[in-house]
């Protein structure tokens, strides 16, 4: 994992500990979008993680016809990034 991925993971953890407790819980997925992003960074690396996480975050809304989703959606670990 590169330094940029580690910085992003640190920022996400900061968000979860400092900012998120003051917001209404709104993630429709399990694991949450922030947990999913951290796992993608650890599994796939920076570029693919950003792509997968962005898609996931944009689908985290209730309107199915516009691509909204919910439920259990873990990171697919079958295709790991080459190291």
Swiss-Prot record:
It comes from the Bacteria. It is found in: Cell inner membrane. Coiled coil: none annotated. Pfam families: YidD. The keyword Isomerase does not apply. It is a peripheral membrane protein. The keyword Cell membrane applies. InterPro entries: Membr_insert_effic_factor_YidD (IPR002696). GO terms for cellular component: plasma membrane. Its main location: membrane. Keywords: Cell inner membrane, Cell membrane, Membrane. Belongs to the UPF0161 family. HAMAP family: UPF0161_YidD (MF_00386). Could be involved in insertion of integral membrane proteins into the membrane. PANTHER family: MEMBRANE PROTEIN INSERTION EFFICIENCY FACTOR-RELATED (PTHR33383:SF1). This is Putative membrane protein insertion efficiency factor. It comes from Pelagibacter ubique (strain HTCC1062).
